[in-house]
Amino acid sequence: MADNARAARMAKRIQQIVAVAIEREIKDPRLEYVTITDTRMTGDLHDASVFYTVRGASIDEEPDVPLAAAALESAKGQLRKIVGDQLSVRFTPTLSFVHDTVPEASAHMEKLLAEARAKDEAVRAQAAQAKPAGEANPYKERN
């Protein structure tokens, strides 16, 4: 069993190797908008999960995640060979690609927070103009 520090170092190195390989060595146009965001290794250093995001060609265009996933799946063997050539380890880890949903989740959270702020501001504006129901002093005074 490898220590966690070694697994973390190897994961970081695999992330760099895969990112550079996708950018420079793999000639698949479907991978043009793929970004490698994170890599995690198992404790035995035999499997690496590579997390990726996909962006659209423009800001308004939706990313084609299934197309990018298919491209990564077809390039998996070539990427593993590149990783094996550049890592000096006895066993080259198998690569599995996982779509990273953190950017979409954080964008959704930001949207929800913006809606909550807008509702808070509306309540604050309504409270500033509100007058108490009934008399100004709601408590009965004894004479």
From Swiss-Prot:
Residues 123-143 are annotated as: Disordered. Transmembrane segments: none annotated. GO terms for molecular function: ribosomal small subunit binding. Keywords: Cytoplasm, Ribosome biogenesis. Pfam families: RBFA. It comes from the Bacteria. Residues 124-136 have a biased composition (Low complexity). The keyword Cytoplasm applies. GO terms for biological process: maturation of SSU-rRNA. One of its GO terms (cellular component) is cytosol. It is found in: Cytoplasm. The keyword Transmembrane helix does not apply. Monomer. Binds 30S ribosomal subunits, but not 50S ribosomal subunits or 70S ribosomes. Belongs to the RbfA family. One of several proteins that assist in the late maturation steps of the functional core of the 30S ribosomal subunit. Associates with free 30S ribosomal subunits (but not with 30S subunits that are part of 70S ribosomes or polysomes). Required for efficient processing of 16S rRNA. May interact with the 5'-terminal helix region of 16S rRNA. PANTHER family: RIBOSOME-BINDING FACTOR A, CHLOROPLASTIC-RELATED. This is Ribosome-binding factor A. It comes from Corynebacterium urealyticum (strain ATCC 43042 / DSM 7109).
